[in-house]
Amino acid sequence: MTIITEKIAVLLGGTSQERNISLISGYNILNSLLKSGIHAVAIDTKDFPITQLPHQKFTKAFIALHGRDGEDGTIQSVLKYLNIPFTGSKTLPSAISINKFKTKLLWQSFNLPVVPYLHINKHEFNKKFLQKFKKNISLLGLPIIVKPNQEGSSIGITIVYSYETLYKACKTAFIFDNSILIEKFIYGEEYTISILGKKILPIIRICPENTFYNYNSKYLSNRTTYFCPSGLNKLKELELKKITLTAWNIIDGTGWGRVDVIMDYKNKFWLLEANTCPGMTDHSLFPMSAKKAGISYQILVQKILELAN
């Protein structure tokens, strides 16, 4: 394989709220590449000017960045300009998928099931605004979930059980972004679907210790339970795969990625979000799903790299 003679930049760290997770993912990926005999170097984009990659003879980039400037199309557009092949989706799919509001609009235009929501911009937000929209918000019903539009890893998210706490929840979300979503909180079972190339890996059902799959449940807790196989019957699994692939193809996702879905108590699926650069930590779902498919972490990293374009 010619891949062995190449020089791979593992882009990690960065400046987003998810920097720490990116560092863990990135160094896991780096160590795996080195074990495979691949010449790879860790590049923290917080300190390293990306435009220097060609001058240092890097031939490909493995993007292990999460959040803004790494998962939002920014780094992808620079790498494309530099003519350096990179892992994951291209610029536009990355920019769309990190923006939950625009992703929802796109999916809705194809009649896919998205969780009912309201979108609010920071410049129009105040207590009077919430009063004005109280009827719209009440149509969602309590509880509701307030989240920044462009943050991952459940950062800045609050579950609101009473209207008295809604203003504070919105203020918290606005710390992290200039626009937020207020969504209907769906009680049910969450599923994550990993996609490698054009293949769907085994589906995982997520059962957090508490009601919500938050940052602690994702990265720190050992009490979150994962079921893979998911326990869905064949018909529901086929339905979920169809919805997922359609959603992924609509945003033009390529390489590898993950789509998160929740099934309510009436057995209806609702799309949550798409992730074009999933985590690769010890707690991460993508390598967990790959392992169930018989793909080791080391082989998985190689396969993702081979899909770089």
Curated annotation (Swiss-Prot):
Cofactor: Mg(2+); Mn(2+)
Main location: cytoplasm
InterPro entries named in the record: ATP-grasp, ATP_grasp_subdomain_1, D-Ala_lig_Van_CS, D_ala_D_ala, Dala_Dala_lig_C, Dala_Dala_lig_N, PreATP-grasp_dom_sf
Catalytic activity: 2 D-alanine + ATP = D-alanyl-D-alanine + ADP + phosphate + H(+)
EC number annotated for this UniProt entry: 6.3.2.4
Residues annotated as binding ATP: 137-192
SUPFAM superfamilies in UniProt: Glutathione synthetase ATP-binding domain-like, PreATP-grasp domain
GO cellular component: cytosol
Keywords: ATP-binding, Cell shape, Cell wall biogenesis/degradation, Cytoplasm, Ligase, Magnesium, Manganese, Metal-binding, Nucleotide-binding, Peptidoglycan synthesis
Record: residues binding Mg(2+) 2: E273, N275
GO biological process, one term: peptidoglycan biosynthetic process
Gene Ontology molecular function: ATP binding; D-alanine-D-alanine ligase activity; metal ion binding
ATP-grasp domain ranges (all copies): 104-306
Pathway: Cell wall biogenesis; peptidoglycan biosynthesis
Cofactor binding mode and count: Binds 2 magnesium or manganese ions per subunit.
Subcellular localization: Cytoplasm
Binding-site positions, Mg(2+) 1: D260, E273
Tagged with keyword Signal: no
Function description: Cell wall formation.
PANTHER family for the chain: D-ALANINE--D-ALANINE LIGASE, D-ALANINE--D-ALANINE LIGASE B
Stated family: Belongs to the D-alanine--D-alanine ligase family.
Name of the protein: D-alanine--D-alanine ligase
Organism encoding this protein: Buchnera aphidicola subsp. Baizongia pistaciae (strain Bp)
